Amino acid sequence: MIYKMAHVQLLLLYFFVSTVKAFYLPGVAPTTYRENDNIPLLVNHLTPSMNYQHKDEDGNNVSGDKENFLYSYDYYYNRFHFCQPEKVEKQPESLGSVIFGDRIYNSPFQLNMLQEKECESLCKTVIPGDDAKFINKLIKNGFFQNWLIDGLPAAREVYDGRTKTSFYGAGFNLGFVQVTQGTDIEATPKGAETTDKDVELETRNDRNMVKTYELPYFANHFDIMIEYHDRGEGNYRVVGVIVEPVSIKRSSPGTCETTGSPLMLDEGNDNEVYFTYSVKFNESATSWATRWDKYLHVYDPSIQWFSLINFSLVVVLLSSVVIHSLLRALKSDFARYNELNLDDDFQEDSGWKLNHGDVFRSPSQSLTLSILVGSGVQLFLMVTCSIFFAALGFLSPSSRGSLATVMFILYALFGFVGSYTSMGIYKFFNGPYWKANLILTPLLVPGAILLIIIALNFFLMFVHSSGVIPASTLFFMVFLWFLFSIPLSFAGSLIARKRCHWDEHPTKTNQIARQIPFQPWYLKTIPATLIAGIFPFGSIAVELYFIYTSLWFNKIFYMFGFLFFSFLLLTLTSSLVTILITYHSLCLENWKWQWRGFIIGGAGCALYVFIHSILFTKFKLGGFTTIVLYVGYSSVISLLCCLVTGSIGFISSMLFVRKIYSSIKVD
């Protein structure tokens, strides 16, 4: 019956997944255009940037009073007053795309293959002073527009001084900021006079009353350059898109001279804004199959290689020390214990064998521990498979949100394994409340994450961000969870209860618990946790920086090969360090290894991940909402890391303990 139920659930999941649009693999299903064919231009949300630079009057990069926001805005949010088509149509998106804030719509731009345009009028809008203040604030804080043409992000050309290479960076500026100086007597632009305190920087020459102003210029003209590949016989494919935004102050459409004054929105009056665009086509030798190569830029790979090689050597050294020390010590212990005359010498002996009557004693809160470990195993398998598939190239960045969608599906499927593990561990603890374990394992951790997401959703709603996950999407996720994951989890728990024999211990548990002697300071839980967490954290520290920039600032992350190798190092170090500390604790007659194995394996690394995320905020966070979102999501990431590494530490310790105590003779 259990097998049939699991089989039916898998068939239903296969049916649902098969009805969804297939994942877009590199080199599959290109769109071929003929001359004058329409090329759709889609618009996405406006997102913050990380390394946006202000410029002075000579065009040089200068530092400015820039804040960083961690939420995006809908392109057609009514305060932007962008031109709209006759009928705004939302484009279909994957589940992962919606979760990560994509809001893709059609646009009024008319692009036709090989049909160039010069200063084509788009529309005229009126931007009130209050909305002008809002737009100027986003310009000064480096917000980017994000367009999509034939599945490619409209980009800007970026030069990486470290690698001496150029690449295409997704998105382009909402506007520009010019840093200029003036005195109180000099006439300054209205936008600079009426902006709030953040326009005026702290640099001031009191004697001459010279102030430094940030003048935000709004981009209202777009030079669109489309690169195409000629396939012959009149067939063409889009292989690159660059957009150069220009700010032009004008009183009538049809004039696009860039030598005139730029447009700065007056925050005290209504502003008439004319939007225009130009289109050019450049033939390129780049084939369609390699068009993403220009976007998938690895920032300073030498740092990543250096970090991975160095830490790989550390892991090899650590592994050698741990394995050699344990094998040597255990070999000596086994020989001594198995030759021991229990009647004469047992009371004189010491070491981990003396714990044989307590080492398999059920810990306090065994139900909670089993649920956390099972949830950690579920997350571990999800992360491993997701990174592995991405490293092989199955999850292309051209399929927006595919990674998040696959992670959600895998997490639901691995609910079977997570619940099986949770129930097996609960049997290992001889827990009596198996029904509570069956119900809570698929609900506790996902429910906690859902509540946190809903709470953070309210903060996103407060600032009118496009990152708000719609209620319909949340209900759909919960529906899928109850339809697929929970039945699979129940099946895993029931099978484990009937078929899993982890409750068969190699030694019997005494009725009276053995007193634990005094432990050295470095083996106490908190110091041991802090020491053990250094090694797994070190294996992923470099990759965390790139993951954060991708999550918060809309950068394309495609270094999954580095990430997969780093995750392997994380797994090895978490396992080895926890086993080493568990062994030395047992040698000092501390038989309470269960919670220590989980905490030492997971809490230290999670703590360092959280501290790293806080140190990552060397940039200035803008506003209370941004701080709450950053701390909230960073806490979720750290807690999930704790579950993954904690489950690695616990299972490694459990297998180690069972192995060594099954290898000795106990009467």
From Swiss-Prot:
Site, as annotated: Cleavage: 250-251
Pfam hit, one: EMP70
Transmembrane segments: 303-323, 371-391, 406-426, 443-463, 475-495, 528-548, 561-581, 597-617, 636-656
Cytoplasmic-side segments: 324-370, 427-442, 496-527, 582-596, 657-667
Topological type in the membrane: Multi-pass membrane protein
Keyword Acetylation attributed: no
GO CC terms of this entry: endosome; endosome membrane; fungal-type vacuole membrane
Positions in the Lumenal compartment: 23-302, 392-405, 464-474, 549-560, 618-635
Descriptive protein name: Transmembrane 9 superfamily member 1
Natural source organism: Saccharomyces cerevisiae (strain ATCC 204508 / S288c)
